[in-house]
Amino acid sequence: MQALMEMQIGASEVVQVLDTGCAVLPPESPLPMPEQSLRKGRLQVPRQRTAPLGIGLRRFYLIGGTMAMSLIATWVMLAVMWPGGINVLEGCLLVLFMFLFAWVTMSFASALAGFFCVVFGGGRKLGIDPQVPLPDLHTYTALLVPTYHEDPCRLLAGLQAIYESLAETGQLEHFDFFVLSDSRREEFGLAEEREYAALCERLGAHDRIFYRRRADNAGRKAGNIADWVRRFGGAYQQMLILDADSVMTGDTIVRLVAAMESNPDVGLIQSLPVVVGGRTLFARMQQFGACVYGPIIAYGVAWWHGAESNYWGHNAVIRTKAFADHAGLPALPGRKPFGGHVLSHDFVEAALIRRGGWATHMVPYLQGSYEEGPPTLTDLLIRDRRWCQGNLQHAKIVTAAGLHWISRMHMLIGIGHYFTAPMWGLLMLVGIAIPLVGDGIDLTAGMHFSPAHYWHGRTDGDVLWIFTFTMFVLLAPKLLAYFALLFKPYERRACGGALRVLLSILLESILAALMAPVVMYLQSRGVFEVLAGKDSGWDAQQRDDGKLSWSVLLRSYGGLSVLGVLIGALAYTVSPPLAMWMSPVVLGMAFSVPVVALTSHRLVGAVLRRWGIFLIPEETAPSKVLIRVAELRRARQP
């Protein structure tokens, strides 16, 4: 089959026509999408009808509980450091401790709420009940799949599985599908066109599946979606945004759309995508963590988000008119990386939709929503660098006029997530510096296994209390997730049983601890690069299993390994007990090359799967749509 003929329309669009004469785009139905002002605007509806009862008390619990626990821990830390006065370094340590402890405490408080929601079946809203028969739909929804230099075979295999799953619901006539390409390289464009034409031929769906490739991909993904809204959005009451690796069941899609129909003041409903398809050790570890820890985290944030939920950019249904009226993103003033197009657009779009008077919700209990994770730590960190820039860019948006205070909180949490990495690093360096510059401290005296030895008048008991309480707050979400899983017999068995789940959690915790210093270092570097004005660019994501050569690993992590050895040697010079306390960080940095290499292997992931480690229900009992995706991808492999 020949490639598609192209007819230039205007300055920025290419409408394409199959050589059989079948148009690949429907008639246009324009919908105005004005650019929103960040300097003017007001919150249209302060309290939403669909907000849960007692939402103010929920938020008071989160913020008040975080502040109370943080103040208690800070007071104890101050008491530990107070005898003899506090010097500049100790003051820095106290401030860093206060902010970091508050950070982990807020996560703990949210996870605790999520635990009770999971165990006792709370958090259901918007009338969505997965157990009742499917409701009948009365409106039209467009499924949008933006793509940029993705493998079209993988992409359209997922789309075909979704199409077939929707057909099984008997309500396919309420949906159209759009593949929205921003690919710049011609080989990708031609491959997309060939696979699209073949898909339409297989399904007989020329009038339901459409393809558009932009000649000018201004605005990246956000611009891609906005272009579709302005050209075709008027024909659809809802749009469902999918990533290139997203898969959803027809049942889940119909229930989400039905919830939009029955709640006319709701502008966005975010599902909880389950991470699937991983084969490397790293990918399987990540998807196991998302499966076991993800529910209590998602239920927790949904519990206090209420009708001001966040948006993750995919696997969510959006009211098209609400999006068009309120989510047109302006270009930010100034140079990149802080100026230009909004990178992490999803947070901002949700905030603007909420400012416009529409509710935004998350429904973590609705199953049948899937995505894939990066295959290696390297791939995750490449993507994370772009997210870092996008979140720090929100510093220019968080003060925008009229935003709900919870929307501002979402952005501040995103910014804080990346600043915690250099703060942890500074905490470690200050901890080394204190005994080095301490007045009258004999570095050769004693072998006490406690940092209390380095501060005059301090007791081991107080320091160990702080350490124990901090570790409890850090690890409690994992323990709560394990206990919550024990209350769910099907999920417990599908994950390999209680013992294998516990072993998996222990192994995941060890591997995560070894990789944490790598993440800390590279996130810190990313923050400093953004602050120095370095742009992240826009590259295609790695979806298949990554293959990392030793030369690439040494180039990426060799310097970090040397730094880890130097820090370890310095700590040992100060005191062997201090080196012992710092060993988790030092070992993670020093052995970063073999750790990343080991976790990037498919063979290790396969062996652990045979042993029942890191199992998830989607591996032991995959849904029909996931089975179909795997079949289609195998069939399209050369």
Swiss-Prot record:
Q: Name one GO molecular function term.
A: hexosyltransferase activity
Q: Which gene encodes it?
A: opgH
One GO biological process this protein is involved in is:
glucan biosynthetic process
Regions that span the bilayer: 60-82, 97-119, 415-437, 464-486, 499-521, 578-600
Cross-referenced HAMAP family, in alphabetical order?
Answer: MdoH_OpgH
Question: Which pathway is this protein engaged in?
Answer: Glycan metabolism; osmoregulated periplasmic glucan (OPG) biosynthesis
Q: What name does the UniProt record give this protein?
A: Glucans biosynthesis glucosyltransferase H
Q: Which organism's genome codes for this protein?
A: Xylella fastidiosa (strain 9a5c)
Question: Gene3D superfamilies per the record?
Answer: Spore Coat Polysaccharide Biosynthesis Protein SpsA, Chain A (3.90.550.10)
* SUPFAM superfamilies in the cross-refs: Nucleotide-diphospho-sugar transferases (SSF53448)
What is the membrane topology noted in the UniProt record heading this document?
Answer: Multi-pass membrane protein
Family of the protein in this entry: Belongs to the glycosyltransferase 2 family. OpgH subfamily.
